[in-house]
Amino acid sequence: MSDITHKMNELSVGDGANRASGAAAGGETPSGSSGRSQYVPPHLRNRPNGGSTPSRRGDFGSRSNGFGSGRRGDFNSSGFQFGSGRRGNSGFGGRGGFGGGSGRYNSPKPGVGQWVDGKHEPAAPNERLEKELFGVAEDPSVQSSGINFDNYDDIPVEATGDGVPEPISAFTAPPLDPLIVENIKLSRFTKPTPVQKYSVPIVASGRDLMACAQTGSGKTGGFLFPVLSESYMNGPDAVPESQGAFSSHKVHPTALVMAPTRELVSQIFEEAKKFSYRSWVRPCVVYGGADIGTQIRNLDRGCDLLVATPGRLKDLLERGRVSLSNIKYLVLDEADRMLDMGFEPQIRHIVQECDMPGVESRQTLMFSATFPRDIQMLARDFLKDYIFLSVGRVGSTSENITQKVLYVEDDEKKSVLLDLLSANDNGLTIIFTETKRMADNLADFLYDQGFPATAIHGDRSQYEREKALAAFKSGTAPILVATAVAARGLDIPNVSHVVNYDLPGDIDDYVHRIGRTGRAGNVGIATAFFNRNNRNVVKGMIELLSEANQEVPDFLQKISREGSYGSKGGFGSMRGGAGRGVLGGGSRGGSRDFRRSGGGFGSSGSSGSNWGSSSSGNGGYRSSSNYGNPSSGNSWW
């Protein structure tokens, strides 16, 4: 990793401070100048025929098969949806899956347990299914504990509320059910992360939970482990008596997990399959952009844990295909992101206006990377006597990530990117752009330069996105160009490098992006291309780098002193009366339990306890600069 950083330091992109002042880049000479040779980028040096790149299309197939043009990413992704004989079949049933039908009431299927006469009867172990679900110990695509994982024990945790239970220090039964402990061992996870140490006993004691935790801290396991464990021990409720002609087609899940994006719910579902192995609980996933008929057929096979995006779930509720009357556990994952995406009306309709049990009759777990005013209001309405959990410095990036900021003008970005990719030829790389057109353009450019790349963005179909992600995870296309659709929640093991080709306008988006590397205690590199077009986030960049003990380039300090940055993404911008504060530092209340502040919402005073105050300065919320990210994927990080 240090070799890569050293190579980046040597990149001939000119001195940032000089560029900031408008000076020409050192080492570049017009072709007509005498006495100085023309600059040749490192990725073109030592190549025959003037640096021409031999075509590698024969190695990776034509453009129509994957890495180029509009059909880029068309890779074989069979097995991306486990237990499915047809594309997009995302339930446990189906050909090759955990078995169709009702595993709870009919004859048992491989890997599917039963609940019989008030007792949980786990299925017998199945070697084939275990290999498909958990892989093998030597599988590099399975990421468990990283080299810095023990450092997580030093992360401070603050749990507030009445009667906070003692945290656990290991995955043991009790308090966990023996089956979930076995499945955790199969996943090769040896110790709980800080959020899991607290969430397991909190849920086991019947309490509600509002949790903020730093990126890569195991939030998905933080709710799946205790919810599944309690489900195994307590079993399902009886299905209500039929009412109406179509009531027999309804499913009555015990647990509901809502998350904002297709990618995130798919990854949570993949993890739920692992940890529900051999149990009576059958997980299902539903999301927009995929065939609803296929998803309904999966639901008809049985669904005990439903993972859903709010829009598709609302559609299924209106069709009479899902009943929430048996919900014991409600989980809102990335709650702040769901509200940012405009899902609050759908969420409130689902929770408050459908047949879901009231707040006193269910357990509610809310996980949010940030805690602005609208999330506080949601917690007030959806949770009862909850415990507030703040893990680590939620408002900062992980020190496992080495951050490097390069001053690069827009017309030089492609050349510098090729230099970076040439220096970092190991591991997976994610490149973030701001627009869909740039994502496609850049992936085509990289392909033409001999770098196998694929892209995902909002205009690609779910099938295309799944195939592109499958190719990236497998290493067939080790470079993924992505827009913000993949910035949050997307968890892919062994991502060693994240490049912000285009910096976002908000600092919290930057932190969520670079959080795709350095996960589970592993180390990673994040490179950002900065120029004067990004001066609106310069203050936030400086604070981030300082908090994470990273080098702050001189050109950032210089541009910051000019005082020419704007409010978007900087400090001082407000959203609905409350900015998005940096969490976890000193008197800044972003990751604190607002119930202790006594300041209420939207007060105008100047005390640090005023939440969302328009005049509270550093004592209240500030602009978009809080971060942290729940995730899931091939691991539960």
UniProtKB/Swiss-Prot annotation:
Q: Where in the cell is it found?
A: Cytoplasm
- Composition-biased stretches (Low complexity): 14-27, 75-84, 606-637
Query: Has the keyword ATP-binding been applied to this entry?
Result: yes
Please state every residue range assigned to the domain named Helicase C-terminal.
400-560
Using the UniProt annotation, give all residue ranges assigned to the region (Disordered): 1-121, 567-637
Residues in Helicase ATP-binding domain copies: 200-389
* Catalyzed reactions per annotation: ATP + H2O = ADP + phosphate + H(+)
Q: What EC number(s) is this enzyme filed under?
A: 3.6.4.13
PROSITE patterns reported in the protein's UniProt record: DEAD_ATP_HELICASE, HELICASE_ATP_BIND_1, HELICASE_CTER, Q_MOTIF
List the biased-composition ranges (Gly residues).
85-103, 567-589
Tell me if Zinc-finger is a UniProt keyword of this record: no
Q: What class of enzyme is it?
A: hydrolase
Motif extent (DEAD box)? 333-336
Q: Which residues bind ATP?
A: A213, Q214, T215, G216, S217, G218, K219, T220
The text the record gives for the protein's domains is: The Q motif is unique to and characteristic of the DEAD box family of RNA helicases and controls ATP binding and hydrolysis.
Give the record's family classification.
Belongs to the DEAD box helicase family. DDX3/DED1 subfamily.
Protein name per its UniProtKB record: ATP-dependent RNA helicase DED1
The gene designation is: DED1
